[in-house]
Regions:
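Repeat-blade elements of multi-bladed beta-propeller folds
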Residues: 1-22, 35-62, 75-102, 115-143, ...
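A short beta-strand motif characteristic of beta-propeller blades
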Residues: 30-35, 70-75, 110-115, 150-155, ...
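Sequence/structural signature of beta-propeller modules
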Residues: 266-273
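Short loop/turn segments that connect beta-strands within beta-propeller blades
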Residues: 25-29, 65-69, 105-109, 146-150, ...
Length: 273
């Protein structure tokens, strides 16, 4: 299983590389139903109003009604999809290996707009502040579009951008295979700082209480002040996605282990008198 499961009420939605969507009882793990797509699903569930939106390796985007257990619509992109969907307003946003970002109507799957980026889209777009931030792996870049499809800016890096971006405080954070964590202003795309983490930063960063965390293939986690990039924490384990449990503790994912550590604290800015 390559996709993260999703909790929906008392159910757990799981996408499988065997081409099945499974809905399980949260309490017991009992299978409620399984729906066969027939293609590996690396895209994680994105569920709104009982409908699961996702893509598959066969190049299709699906909307599956989990309550009625039937397919609402299918859109054929023609290119492999590993990206998860992002929903915002009246759009489903998802990237494909054809180097495109798709904006589809949630109710019908009809195209709102399609735009090209520099290369394959492996990660999930982030939508915030009226903008869609799209990582490109082979394009080695992050591109911002308006929700209407106008390209606003692009930031190039020295390596693949597999990482899905995180947005906090008017800034966009993402990692690159050049070993750096980037902080970019959401408006205008100006690079505010770059932090060398080492290895390849392939996992999505997470921002907790003003501290941005990123892991790398060098098996280390770094926590930095989200505003300045100053390093506040170095943890010699972990590799992929840092997740906040309660704002005070972090769950850090390694290759085969899960670590729980105390979250770093960002220094308070002195008040002016």
């Amino acid at each position: 299983m390559a996709a993260s499961p999703a909790i929906v009420g008392d159910a757990l939605v799981v996408h499988g590389m065997d081409g099945y969507v499974r809905v399980l009882e949260r309490s017991s793990g009992r299978l409620r139903f399984a729906y066969r797509i027939g293609s590996p699903i690396e895209s994680s569930p994105m569920v709104r109003d009982g409908v699961d939106y996702f893509g598959a390796w066969n190049g299709n985007v699906y909307a599956l009604d989990l309550r009625r257990r039937r397919l609402v619509w299918r859109f054929r992109s023609g290119h492999k999809i590993t990206s998860s969907a992002a929903l915002a307003g009246r759009s489903v946003y998802i990237g494909d290996y054809g180097g495109r970002i798709l904006s589809l109507w949630p109710g019908s799957g009809r195209v709102r707009w399609i735009r090209r980026v520099d290369g394959r889209v492996y990660g999930t777009p982030a939508v915030a502040r009226g903008r869609v931030f799209v990582p490109s792996s082979t394009g080695r870049s992050l591109t911002a579009f308006s929700t209407g499809g106008r390209r606003l800016w692009r930031v190039r890096t020295g390596g693949y951008v597999y990482s899905s971006p995180a947005v906090w405080g008017g800034r966009v954070y993402f990692g690159s295979y050049d070993g750096r964590l980037y902080a970019v202003r959401a408006r205008g795309g100006r690079v505010l700082w770059r932090l060398r983490v080492g290895g390849h930063v392939s996992g999505a960063p997470a921002v907790v209480a003003g501290v941005v965390y990123a892991g790398s293939t060098a098996e280390r986690i770094v926590g930095a002040d989200a505003r300045t990039g100053r390093v506040l924490l170095r943890f010699p384990h972990g590799q992929y996605v840092p997740v906040s449990g309660n704002g005070r503790r972090l769950l850090l994912h390694g290759y085969s282990r899960l670590y729980a550590v105390e979250a770093a604290r960002r220094p308070r800015t002195p008040r002016r008198r």
